[in-house]
Design a protein with these regions (language model features):
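A donor-sugar binding/catalytic signature common to diverse glycosyltransferases
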Residues: 60-107
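Leloir-type glycosyltransferase catalytic cores
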Residues: 103-119
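Core catalytic architecture of nucleotide-activated donor-dependent transferases building glycoconjugates
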Residues: 1-60, 91
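Residues at the C-termini of beta-strands that transition into short coil/loop
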Residues: 56-58, 99, 115
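Generic serine detector
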Residues: 8, 13, 23, 37, ...
């Protein structure tokens, strides 16, 4: 939800390219990366991973459904991507989540399930 967070006055920090690079390294081997965003233009200009597929033109519900069907999930600090990962029924999924969810130093230990990577 990058587009939403550009106007949030720091309530939710925007994840860095380095966060996504580290997350892809944790996932390891993959056939392709599906990119879901409300700021696809920025993603196309700034994310440089092999085999990217930019998902465009869907409703939010369609995106949520597609995200929940992915083999793994790299999520932002958003409830939208959190729910997509939570609803993913792949028993062997790897979920990578940002450690910092809010601009203020708040306790977020109860947000991320223990089996998810928190970087």
């Amino acid at each position: 939800r990058r587009g939403d967070y550009l106007t949030s006055n720091g309530a939710h920090p925007i994840q860095t390219i380095e966060y996504y690079e580290k997350s892809v390294n944790i996932i390891g081997e993959y056939d392709y990366i599906m990119i879901f965003s409300d700021d696809i233009t920025w993603c196309k200009e700034n994310l440089k991973f092999p085999n990217m597929v930019f998902v465009e033109g869907n409703t939010d519900v369609q995106d949520l459904w597609c995200m929940s069907l992915c083999k793994n999930n790299i999520i932002a600090n958003s409830s939208f991507s959190w729910w997509a990962a939570w609803l993913n029924i792949n028993d062997n999924k790897v979920v990578v989540s940002p450690q910092r969810w809010f601009g203020l130093p708040l306790n977020t230990s109860n947000i991320i399930p223990q089996e998810w990577y928190n970087i």
